Amino acid sequence: MSKNEKLSAEEKALFRGLMSGTRQLSQDTIVHKPPRKKFNQVPVKRLLSEQMDASHYFSDEFQPLLASEGAVRYVRSDVSHYELKKLRRGDFTPEIFLDLHGLTQKQAKQELGALIAACRREHIFCASVMHGHGKHILKQQTPLWLAQHPWVMAFHQAPKLFGGDAALLVLIEVEEWLPPELP
């Protein structure tokens, strides 16, 4: 029967007669909520904790011994100077960039801490930190802060391609990647 066809009075009476001893059912269907999907995102609280932990190393009073002549550079004592040479030549391509333009020193420290924590978490070996020229405050402080951090292996003034003397290429010691354990 199509929707356009009307039922006759006789058909309606027959239907009502057949349904006379029945009662209406109440809705008893349980609607199951779909299971929540687990996100691979790091909780905000953990991100803030990592950022604060990583920026804890940055002191304005500590003055590490950096080369005073030539390009800004630093290599940790247990790291080969060849890594510094590869940084200078641009053999490493930064996978992540941080722009500190317009930030205060406190904000810049927090962002550097967050960058280092993110690099370790995401297994990123090389990063570019653009401090800019400006009033030379961040340009002077950024190398001093980076040299204090134990996870920074080396840094060098970036090649022109990545910002020249307004940026630094940083090598970060990443956590060893282990495949997930199978049950």
UniProtKB/Swiss-Prot annotation:
Disulfide bonds: none annotated. Its EC number is 3.1.-.-. Acts as a ribosome collision sensor. Detects stalled/collided disomes (pairs of ribosomes where the leading ribosome is stalled and a second ribosome has collided with it) and endonucleolytically cleaves mRNA at the 5' boundary of the stalled ribosome. Stalled/collided disomes form a new interface (primarily via the 30S subunits) that binds SmrB. Cleaved mRNA becomes available for tmRNA ligation, leading to ribosomal subunit dissociation and rescue of stalled ribosomes. Residues 98-173 form the Smr domain. This is Ribosome rescue factor SmrB. One of its GO terms (molecular function) is RNA endonuclease activity. Coiled coil: none annotated.
